[in-house]
Curated annotation (Swiss-Prot):
Pfam families tied to this protein: FtsK_SpoIIIE
GO molecular function: ATP binding; ATP hydrolysis activity; DNA binding
Xref: PROSITE patterns: FTSK
Transmembrane segments: 43-63, 65-85
Species assigned in the record: Mycobacterium tuberculosis (strain CDC 1551 / Oshkosh)
Protein's recorded name: ESX-3 secretion system protein EccC3
Length: 1330
């Protein structure tokens, strides 16, 4: 049976009905009467008696003539008596009460008329939505057929009859103090009015199917069926078959009561046929009906009592009183399913009344509802529909079928005018893209329908400039939350994108908040970018601004260059440019750029400077085909400045206040738009300033798209024969074939309309130009950065990451150039900003393009140990941490020696001409310091608050660059960089800072710091000094890639020169010749340059050695004794050795030399030595010439005192030298020891040495004479300081050498007990130090 498609139109507006409040004034009050006291009641009578008595007295006394003055006093008493009697009488007169009562009753009469008018409107509205069943026959084919949609308030509400209902308007009486005081007649009239008018009788009342899952109906069978027919008639008249389905199970299916259902399209089973056409959900067996409905019921969720717009509602009627519904699958409530069961079993007395499963009884023309314990009136006059009337209605509806595009994308307001129907698209899943993108006339370009007007006509949105007949170029849209602003924006975008290729239109969607709907357009070929969530990622807002400025500049330059080429002068607008193309000039097309700035007021709140940007782009964009649609929830005139003045068309959706509505569309209509989801997308369009607002509703495009259903089955009869049309299924004849194609066309998963269209458009035509590059959000692997940079090897340039330049619409490599003035670099960043990782990238990138002989790195790791991962790289000479002070000092020693060596070679700078590197094996050398703050706080004390090595770093920064020595540092604070160093750091990169106020990056005229836009959660992201965002590449240091091993494999046998360390045991032969001349002994190796340390006793004959036990004091004495003895004779050298602990007892001395361990021998030995040395002074009386030629005769005498702190410095208490101190004879000779041939060497413990230097006369004199001092290992906490230097825990034989120079020197003393020839700096040798 073929049917006509019924095209539903906009629903007719029902009669208006108010649901406000009528406030009724309270009745008048009567004052309360309080009885007076006995005295007050008696006092007037007493005064009257007094007056009469006075008059009698006057007459009795003979005063015949009474003067007025005499009568004054009685008159006053009379007035007082009257006042006492009437003054406090609060009783109202009867006339006053009657008058107020009459006024109030007249007032109630007016109120009654108003209430009746409201009640009449309510009844008329109810009768409009729910007319009498007898009127339903006239509805089919009219505009009202199938008028209800899921968003209508009366959707699935079926009229059951007439009943007394509450008045929709609230009646409220003003508060009164107490009802006792009210005037009784007025009060009674008010109560009567309220009791009568608060309800309306005989009003159509319905049953909401969305709120009930099962209805059980009892009563006489004929009446019950008549009632159910009325319900079904109401349902099928007002509801489209796509939103409502009807199913019936009845024993007498072919009888008059139910046979008429077969004509209704609501009972058809989609995709199934029988011998007569569409199969029907009609059966004589409830179980068979359940089997037919099985696929429909299977996936439905449980019943919740809430509307289910996405599901087709099923009304299932089971007319079988004997069927046990509770034991069937229909007993379980399902969403979008209502089961009506005709039952014969009355509920038992204690049965609970379930509001979701009501039990109704039809009796005496009324309907009662079961409440726990008994029946209660439900419908006063139940509707009944005869079988003939139902058959007549069904036959009238049978000729119509629903529009297949009804479901899904058709809203209640636009009705059949969906997105596809407005654009003339039959099936959005099979678009004819070439036809949609076909060239248009200029007046039709950028002109698309986006909804329907209040009269049902398509609303055309014309984006062109008003000079070309459009509404543009710029517009303003305001709509509060829930107004459908996003829905309207998506409708505009989808209409434009579907009908225009990327050669004619490109789009930038900028959403400051980050709505999910914007992402739906990300894959469209015309969409340049969807920029969302700019509130959290402030850098995106900056990129958006730069992109707009850059596109304006790009189009301006393109018009200028093309105009000069074509006509000799620049084109003034894109229109002139297109005219040149039409004239035959070969020019690339310039598409219109449509910018949607959603939530732009929030953007201006955070970035007020962008108001000038929008104003600039809006003014320039008119000629350059850059159109902007500003959208927001509210309008803050103070923030948007002149933006609204640059807009031509206005769109006002539901707004929060009348004032905002007036600002947008000129009237308050946008404020009066009703709230609720059924009114989303309703608004007013003002196409030009001063134009009349046009009410419209945008199409809904964000729903699931269901393609038009094609016939799934075909009936082919070999010999056509007429058949009787019955309600039950009709089996086909043997010669009839039903071909089912369900399996040939599997159903695709549900997809939204936007995604369905976007996928098809992406396969056609060109894509939009890449005006917006992806932001620096994704990690850049170092391998990718190397490939993109295109830097060749041996150029001493390498990429570090990428710089984002949205204004130029490109991303450039961040390249370090070692040969430029920016050869020194500082990376400034806060905690966890990626500083250490940036250094890893720096080193690995350089190593990937250069050999270890071309670049080498020496690292000081104060940043957490990340540089330690590169210590095995062939290009890395050393990685030293804060726990390796010796390696740090040696690193500076190596670099300073390298600098000195290169300074002495004049040809070093000439290497740049041919790209050659110096032949010293280092190449370009980089000192890398991770965390300058930690480095500057290391090796400090209370007198030196900063690391002394900082001065050496500054020297390398300012001098080393010219000699191929570079300094790369990171710091958490720019203040940690010394002033003298800052100018030498040519490349400054700033990562995320803890406080943006510490940033050194500034933009002239900007209201905020660029550092505010650097993301918090992206290490490696930062700014150049030009305020350009960059991102360091990731070094890819993982077990799988292992770049260190891969790079080392490319340079086998090559490595950067390592940092040489002092040996832990220094053999005598490792330093060459030990005796360099008279009194010149090599005692060790210097840390600074690993050169031999020569002890020149001729220049300074005094030597102090301090150190704790087994630090090497005695070993040094042993070396000195052996070296001097092996290179001298007894006539030239003599020794006096004081050795309390017998450590030097086995060292052979010359004959007659003094060796003593006895304390008693010290004083005579010192006296004898003093006499010997005193005798070497020149005799008295010599002339000046004789003195100049005079020298003493004799040997050089070495006085060696081991452990001088063990020798008591107190006077002798007994013996021949009583009162004599041991060192007193010697102290006077120390100042001239060098001239008199005396060499004094003393050793002592480190602990307490600082105290001894102040208390011991001998050591104090040594210190005064600036004796050479060696500080071996000692406890820094207990040993104090010597000449400002503190002891340190050093290995055996390691000492700090203090001379008359400015800085101390670390040395390794020779161990004469080591037999090996030489010990390398990294190898531990066996040997002992004592």
């Amino acid at each position: 049976m073929s049917r006509l498609i019924f095209e539903a139109r906009r629903r007719l507006a029902p009669p208006s009905s108010h649901q406000g409040t009528i406030i009724i004034e309270a009745p008048p009050e009567l004052p309360r009467v309080i009885p007076p006291s006995l005295l007050r009641r008696a006092l007037p009578y007493l005064i009257g008696i007094l007056i009469v008595g006075m008059i009698v007295a006057l007459v009795a006394t003979g005063m015949r003539v009474i003067s007025p003055q005499t009568l004054f006093f009685p008159f006053v008493l009379l007035l007082a008596a009257t006042a006492l009697y009437r003054g406090n009488d609060k009783k109202m007169r009867t006339e006053e009460v009657d008058a107020e009562r009459a006024d109030y009753l007249r007032y109630l009469s007016v109120v009654r008329d108003n209430i009746r008018a409201q009640a009449a409107e309510q009844r008329a509205s109810a009768l409009w939505s729910h007319p009498d069943p007898t009127a339903l026959a006239s509805v089919p084919g009219s505009r009202r057929q199938w008028e209800r949609d899921p968003h209508d308030p009366d959707f699935l509400v079926l009229r059951a009859g007439r009943h007394t209902v509450p008045l929709a308007t609230t009646l409220r009486v003003n508060d009164t103090a107490d009802e006792i005081d009210l005037e009784p007649v007025s009060h009674s009239a008010l109560r009567s009015l309220l009791d009568t008018q608060r309800s309306i009788g005989d009003v159509p009342t319905g049953i909401d199917l969305t709120k009930v899952s099962r209805i059980t109906v009892l009563g006489e069978r004929a009446q019950v069926r008549a009632v159910l027919r009325a319900w079904i008639a109401q349902a099928v008249t007002w509801h489209d078959p796509t939103v409502l389905g009807v199913a019936l199970a009845a024993r007498d299916l072919e009888g008059r009561d139910w046979n008429w259902l077969k004509w209704l399209p609501h009972v058809d089973i989609p995709g199934r046929l029988d011998a007569l056409g569409p199969a029907r959900n009609l059966s004589t067996d409830p179980d068979e009906l359940i089997a037919l409905l099985g696929p429909v019921l299977a996936d439905r969720p449980a019943f919740t009592g809430q509307p289910t717009d996405a599901l087709r509602h099923l009304l299932i009627v089971v007319d079988d009183p004997d069927y046990d519904l509770g034991a069937s699958p229909l007993a379980v409530g399902r969403a979008g399913v209502t089961v009506v069961h005709c039952s014969a079993s009355a509920p038992h007395r204690e049965q609970y009344s379930d509001p979701e499963k009501p039990i109704l009884r039809v009796a005496h023309g009324a309907i009662e509802r079961w409440q726990t314990g008994g029946w209660q009136p439900y419908i006063d006059a139940a509707d009944q529909f005869s079988a003939d009337e139902a058959a007549h209605l069904a036959r009238r509806l049978s000729r119509w079928d629903s529009n297949p595009t009804h479901a899904g994308l058709r809203s209640a307001a636009t009705r059949g005018a969906s997105f596809t129907t407005l654009l003339g698209i039959e099936d959005a899943s099979r678009l004819d893209v070439p036809a949609l993108w076909a060239p248009r006339r200029r007046d039709e370009e950028l002109r698309v329908p986006i909804g329907v007007t209040g009269t049902g006509e398509p609303l055309m949105f014309d984006l062109k400039d008003e000079a070309e007949g459009g509404m543009g170029p710029h517009g303003l849209m305001i709509g509060m939350t829930g107004s459908g602003k996003s829905q309207t924006l998506m409708s505009i975008l989808l209409s434009l994108l579907t009908t225009h290729s990327a050669e004619r239109l490109i789009v930038i969607y900028a959403d400051f908040k980050g709505e999910a709907g914007a992402d739906s357009f990300r894959d469209f070929p015309q969409v340049v970018a969807v920029i969302s969530n700019m509130a959290e990622k402030k850098s995106l807002a900056d990129r958006f601004a730069d992109t707009l400025r850059g596109e304006v500049a790009r189009r301006e330059m393109l018009l200028r260059e093309a105009g000069r080429k074509v006509q000799g002068s620049a084109f003034n607008s894109v229109l002139e440019y297109e005219n040149a193309i039409a004239a035959g000039h070969s020019l690339p097309p310039i598409p219109t750029l449509f910018v949607v700035a959603d939530e732009f007021t929030l953007m201006l709140a955070d970035h007020p400077e962008y108001a000038e940007l929008f104003d600039y782009v809006a003014r320039k964009g008119r000629s350059f085909r850059i159109h902007i649609l500003f959208a927001s929830q509210t309008l803050d005139v103070g923030k948007i400045k002149d933006i609204d003045k640059n807009t031509a068309y206005r769109i006002g959706l539901k707004v929060a206040s009348p004032s905002v509505s007036r600002q947008i569309i000129g009237v308050e209509d946008a404020y009066h738009i009703e709230s609720g989801k059924e009114h989303k997308g309703v608004g007013f369009l003002v196409p030009a300033p001063g134009a009349t607002p046009i009410r419209f509703r945008s199409t809904y495009v964000d729903g699931i798209y269901e393609p038009p259903q094609t016939a799934k089955a075909v009936v082919v009869q070999s010999v056509p024969e007429p058949k009787l049309f019955t309600a039950a299924a009709v089996e086909p004849d043997p010669g009839t074939v039903i071909a089912d194609t369900d399996e040939q066309e599997p159903a695709d998963p549900p997809r939204k309309l936007i995604a369905t269209i976007g996928e098809q458009l992406a396969r056609y035509g060109p894509r939009a130009p890449q005006l917006w590059l992806p932001p620096l959000d994704e990690t850049i692997p170092l391998s990718a950065a190397l490939a993109r940079a295109g830097v060749g090897p041996r150029q001493w340039r390498w990429p570090l990451g990428e710089i984002d330049r949205p204004f130029e619409m490109r991303r450039d490599p961040l390249v370090f150039d070692a040969r430029s003035s920016a050869g020194n670099m500082v990376i400034h960043g806060g905690p966890k900003s990626g500083k250490s990782t940036a250094l890893q990238t720096f080193i690995l990138s350089a190593a990937s393009l250069h050999s270890p002989h071309e670049v080498s790195f020496y690292c000081l790791d104060y940043g957490g140990g990340q540089l330690r991962a590169l210590q095995d790289l062939a290009h890395v000479g050393s990685v030293a941490s804060a726990l390796e002070p010796e390696r740090i000092r040696r690193t500076f020693g190596e670099l300073e020696q390298l600098l000195l060596s290169r300074q002495q070679r004049e040809v070093f700078r000439d290497r740049g001409a041919n790209g050659s590197t110096p032949d010293d094996g280092f190449g370009e050398v980089f000192l890398v310091i991770d965390n300058l703050y930690g480095f500057g706080r290391d090796n400090t004390d209370q007198f030196n608050t900063r690391n002394p090595l900082l001065a050496r770093v500054t020297e390398l920064v300012n001098v080393g660059l010219a000699y191929g020595i570079h300094v790369i540092i990171t710091t958490p604070s720019w203040l940690e960089v010394p002033l003298a160093m800052r100018d030498g750091l040519g490349l400054r990169l700033e990562l995320r800072l803890h406080d943006a106020r510490d940033s050194n990056v500034r933009v002239v005229g900007a209201l905020r710091r660029p550092a505010d836009a650097v993301p918090h959660d992206q290490p490696g992201r930062g700014l150049t000094m030009a305020a350009e965002h960059f991102l360091f590449a990731a070094p890819e240091l993982d077990a799988q890639t292992n770049p260190v091993a891969a790079i080392n494999a490319r340079y086998p046998g090559m490595a950067a020169p390592p940092v040489r360390l002092l040996p832990t045991n220094l053999a005598p032969h490792a330093v060459g010749e030990l005796y360099r001349g008279p009194d010149q002994l090599v005692i060790g190796q210097r840390e600074e340059d690993l050169a031999p340390v020569i002890l020149d006793l001729a220049a300074n004959p005094l030597l102090m050695v301090f150190g704790d036990a087994r630090s090497g004091k005695t070993t040094l004495l042993r070396h000195i004794i052996r070296t001097v003895r092996e290179h001298s004779t007894a006539d030239r050298v003599a020794f006096t050795v004081l050795d309390r602990r017998l450590h030097l007892v086995d060292e052979p001395l010359f004959p007659d030399n003094e060796y003593t361990a006895n304390i008693d021998r010290i004083i005579p030995a010192m006296l004898g030595l003093a006499n010997l040395i005193e005798a070497r002074r020149p005799p008295a009386g010599m002339s000046a010439a004789e003195l100049s030629r005079w020298t003493f005769a004799g040997h050089t005498h070495y006085l060696i005192i081991d452990d001088v702190d063990q020798v008591p410095d107190s006077p002798a208490m007994t013996g021949p030298y009583i009162g004599q101190r041991p060192w007193t004879p010697l102290i006077g000779l120390l100042a001239q020891a060098g001239d008199l041939g005396l060499r004094v060497i003393v050793t002592g413990r480190a602990t307490g040495s600082a105290h001894l230097l102040m208390t011991s006369p001998l050591l104090r004199r040594f210190n005064d004479l600036q004796a050479t001092t060696l500080m071996l290992a000692g406890n820094p906490a207990d040993s104090g300081k010597i000449r400002g230097e503190r002891f340190a825990r050093l290995p055996a034989g390691r000492a700090i050498l203090l001379t008359d120079s400015d800085s101390p020197t670390y040395v390794q003393l020779i161990n004469p007990l080591v037999d090996a020839a030489a010990v390398s700096g990294e190898t531990q040798q066996k040997g002992s130090q004592s």
